[in-house]
C-alpha cells in the first residue's frame, strides 16, 4: 500500500503503532500554516538528496505535504524505491485538518542571546 488516509493515521496513532512521520511541506507553506501533525519531523523537500539516507527502513514511514499530491507522493515513491515502507497521507495536511484531527504548534524559533558590549 502506498497511501494512508487521515482516519487510518489517526487510528495508528491511537493504537501506538510504531512509524515515522515526515512533514515534507515547502518551508513557506509550513510557515504560513504554523502547525504540524504532532510528532512529525520536517524535511525540506527540495533537499531530499541530503536527508534520504537518514530515513530508516526499520519501520513504516508516513509522508505528508500540504495537499497529498506531487511532493508527498513523489517522495513516497522515492523512499519506496530505496526500500522504505513509505506511504503518503491522502489529502496531506489539508485532509488531516478537514477531518478535524489535532495539530501541534511549531516550536518557537530560538533566538541567539543578545551580545552586550
Give the positions of each predicted feature:
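Rhodanese-like catalytic fold shared by cysteine-dependent sulfurtransferases
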Residues: 1-20, 24-62, 67-117
